[in-house]
Regions:
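Solvent-exposed loop segments that connect transmembrane elements
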Residues: 31-40, 77-142, 188-231, 275-371, ...
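Structural signature of Gram-negative outer-membrane beta-barrels, strongest in the C-terminal barrel
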Residues: 54-56, 248-250, 256, 260-266, ...
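Outer-membrane beta-barrel translocator/receptor signature
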Residues: 1-34, 39-49, 57-61, 154, ...
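Gram-negative outer-membrane beta-barrel transporters
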Residues: 397, 515-519, 536-690, 759-763
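C-terminal beta-barrel architecture of Gram-negative outer-membrane proteins
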Residues: 477, 615, 651-713, 724-728, ...
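Membrane-embedded beta-barrel scaffold of Gram-negative outer-membrane proteins
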Residues: 159-165, 169-175, 182-185, 459-475, ...
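Transmembrane beta-strands of outer-membrane beta-barrel pores
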Residues: 25-29, 69-73, 176-180, 263-267, ...
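C-terminal beta-signal and adjacent terminal beta-strands/loops
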Residues: 268, 274-283, 555, 559, ...
């Protein structure tokens, strides 16, 4: 069930002051059942308000104030479903879309690495998600926990309009906006049913059951985990200010102009983290159920310790423990151990002493797992102007010029995988992680740009106008996040546009259409690189033909048609690596399995059909197994992915063809009018990947909608009904990938199923 309510009230406070308040709410029950909990999810709970106040200070001065606020607090997911073909090397095979809502194979992901270090496996990394419960039904999913979605936005604008004279008007504006966004998702998209056998299984210990906390202190939760699982958290806060002052002319002659100054100041803190049971236990051994067992076994309390160095040492101690305990038992019974047993016991004692000598570490919950954290400030200033010249009564020329001063200051935090760099840099000694020496990179991108516009419009008849324009623009560069905060360049765009706006057939046809070409230099495309999204610059060309036509077949019958035909491709020979498929091959011919000396699966390998051998650790790629240990913040010394050319590829997420058609019929009556409208919408196939891999193909989308409404002659109210997606076909309309560290699982959004409802509105 869904309820959508809107309303507005005009309030004439005085002869010179008037106000208007508007509100809206959108509530909907969940459309998807979480089979694991029995709860409904994917609901809606939105509320918004808007207040405007206009004050006529005098005959030439007006002050306008506007405030709007919006809040969403529900359990909608970021995407409806996931896809994966489990693969022991990649996590998810990059060569096929795979099955709906399958989890990646742990052996090819950071989840498996975290689990191994966190003592969840008895000796080697296994695919503990292999028997997980999953669903291929849109309406029924398996999730350990329903998602949470919270967003709050506020925006205020103050505008002063002053008529300086009959010919000149001054407009000054100031606006301020804020946004807070928090989203939590079940990242693995399944309910894992495999117990966490644990590294202590050889000592006769039962499977691990742990009380684990995820997220942050202000945005997270704690739960009891009997199996491994992964959650992701997006936490974004930003605010922006805009200032603008301009002068607009209204001369009687052929020349007019507008000129002004604009400033923009934007600040954001964007955090994204992925956490598993293993990552959270690694942060503090005091949270691990093995802590009291180890204390009893060794006579040493390690509950104050944590982090990768401690856990890796503890793995060695646990491996040595059965033999050491046997030797100690023999000595207690008066038996003489062998020399090898005595040496092993001595080594065991040294290992325990080494662990005890490590400094105490308790990694904060929000630093455990993977964390991408960027603080960005964007500042820009611009001087601009446009001049308008009426060449004659039917022809107008527009000339524009804009000067921009663009700046991007970015601070990127890099605490390392599992906070390994944070520990090594002395992070526990600092209250604020941003103050830890060596863990933040501060970089500034500054540039200036001059752009322009030239346009001409010509009335061929009173109701037929053609135009042509050429416009250039620049978007500033910035810094990528994650463990490789490399800069990306500015983006320059030049657009040429030819169009027609006309009323034809004595006003029975309204027609707007245009042909355009965008020439983009340095267009930003998002790719995947290890634990984060990574922007690259490419040159691209976009050519399109779009239009809108409305035809009145009679006084009571009309049709509407819109269309967009686009050819969009990458034109530069930009070469970059595909971290989801680093070899540039078409398949794997041999899985090498664990290739680390102890056969733990800490490092795995595979031979590809192009003859290359690649290695992975925690989902990270490398062309060599040597000097490669992401868990210790030691990343690949050689190539992480073969560079491939993107030239000739289609731009991601751009459909070649899209159009809509609507038929409207009016049925006039003595007391009012009934209108019936049937609409059809079509969007063609597209691909969501800069590398155009087939698993990112998005099929064509089609839908029929129907609207029936009755409005009385006085127009004071209306009543109607609607039905959307009459055929009840759900289509994928977006797809993206998780990182290679997450196994490259795909996340897809789909159109809503068929829905219908009643509408009613009134003015009073």
């Amino acid at each position: 069930d869904r309820k959508f309510v809107t309303g507005a009230m005009n309030m004439p406070i005085s002869d010179t002051v008037r106000a208007r308040i508007a509100y809206g709410s959108n509530t909907r029950e969940g459309m998807v059942q979480n089979v694991a909990t029995g709860n409904l999810m994917d609901d809606r709970n939105d509320a918004s308000v808007r207040l405007s106040i206009d004050w006529d200070i005098n005959d030439t001065t007006e002050l306008k104030f506007t405030y709007s606020g919006q809040k969403s607090d529900d359990n909608r997911p970021q995407e409806e479903t996931a896809y994966c073909q489990p693969d022991p090397f990649f996590g998810c095979s990059p060569y096929s879309l795979g099955q709906m809502n399958r989890a990646p194979d742990s052996r090819g992901t950071a989840f498996g690495l975290f689990g191994f270090i966190g003592l969840l496996y008895p000796g080697t990394v296994t695919n503990d998600f292999g028997s997980a419960a999953f669903s291929d039904d849109f309406s029924k999913l398996y999730r350990d926990r329903e998602p949470t979605h919270l967003q709050k936005t506020e925006f205020s604008n103050l505008e002063l309009v002053k008529e300086l004279s009959d010919e000149l008007t001054l407009v000054a504006k100031y606006s301020y906006g804020t946004r807070m966004f928090q989203q939590m998702n079940d990242n693995d998209s399944v309910v894992n049913t495999s117990p966490m056998v644990g590294a202590g299984a050889a000592l006769g210990l039962p499977p691990i059951v742990a009380d684990v906390c995820f997220g942050t202190s202000r945005f997270g939760f704690c739960e009891t985990a009997t199996s491994n699982r992964a959650y992701d958290f997006s936490d974004v806060v930003n605010d922006s200010q805009q200032y603008e002052i301009n002068i607009v002319s209204n001369y009687d002659g052929p020349w007019n102009f507008t000129a002004g100054y604009y400033a923009y100041d934007y600040r954001s803190d964007n955090e994204y983290r992925v956490q598993t049971v293993g990552s959270q236990l690694i942060g503090s051994f005091g949270d691990h159920p093995y802590a009291p067992v180890v204390a009893n076994l060794l006579g040493v309390d390690f509950s104050g310790k944590g982090g990768v160095p401690f856990y890796q040492g503890l793995l060695g101690v646990l491996a040595q423990a059965p033999g050491a305990l046997t030797t100690q038992g023999m000595m207690a019974m008066g038996l003489t151990p062998s020399l090898a047993q005595l040496l092993a016991l001595q080594q065991f004692g040294a290992s325990v002493a080494g662990l005890a000598a490590l400094p105490d570490v308790n990694v904060p919950v929000d630093l455990r797992g993977t964390l991408s954290d960027q603080h960005v400030r964007i500042k820009s200033k611009a001087l601009y102007g446009e001049a308008y010249y009426d060449i004659n009564d039917t022809t107008k020329l527009t000339l524009g010029l804009r000067y921009d001063d663009l700046g991007n200051a970015t601070t990127t935090f890099n605490g390392g995988l599992l906070a390994s760099a944070w520990i090594a840099a002395g992070g526990p000694l600092y209250e604020n992680r941003m103050d830890v020496p060596g863990l933040t990179l501060y970089d500034i991108q500054e540039e200036t740009a001059v752009n322009g516009k030239i346009a001409i419009q010509k009335y061929l008849q009173d109701d037929v106008m053609v135009y042509a324009s050429y416009t250039t623009a620049t978007k500033g560069g910035g810094i990528n996040g994650g463990n490789d905060p490399a800069p990306y360049d500015k983006e320059d765009t030049a657009v040429i546009d030819f169009g027609l706006k006309a009323k034809l057939l004595d006003g029975a046809m309204l027609l707007n259409m245009n042909i355009y070409q965008n020439d983009n230099s340095g267009m930003l495309l998002d790719t995947i690189r290890n634990t984060q999204s990574f922007n690259i610059n490419v040159d691209a060309e976009v050519t399109g033909f779009e239009g809108l036509m409305k035809v009145f077949l009679s006084d009571t019958t009309s049709v509407d048609l819109t269309w967009l035909f686009v050819d969009a491709e990458i034109t530069s020979d930009t070469r970059t690596g595909n971290y989801l498929e680093p070899a540039g091959a078409t398949g794997i011919v041999q899985y090498l399995g664990p290739v680390d000396p102890n056969g733990t699966g800490f490092l795995t390998g595979a031979v590809f059909d192009n003859g290359q051998v690649w290695y992975k650790s925690g989902g990270f790629n490398c062309l060599t197994p040597l000097g490669f240990n992401p868990a210790a913040n030691i990343f690949c010394p050689l190539s992480e992915a073969n560079p491939v050319s993107l030239q000739g590829n289609d731009l991601p997420r751009v459909a070649d063809t899209s159009y809509s058609f609507s038929f409207t019929q009016l049925f006039p009556g003595d007391n009012g009018v009934t209108s019936a409208r049937l609409s059809y919408r079509y969007t063609g196939e597209r691909n969501g990947d800069p590398f155009n891999m087939s698993r990112f193909d998005i099929p064509e989308n089609k839908s029929f909608d129907f609207l029936l409404r009755y409005t009385p002659n006085n127009g004071d109210w209306y009543v109607g009904m609607y039905a959307k997606n009459l055929a009840d076909d759900q289509y994928m309309n977006a797809i993206r990938s998780g990182s290679n560290a997450q196994g490259g699982q795909l996340y897809a959004s789909f159109t809503d199923p068929r829905s219908w409802g009643i509408q009613f509105g009134s003015s009073f």
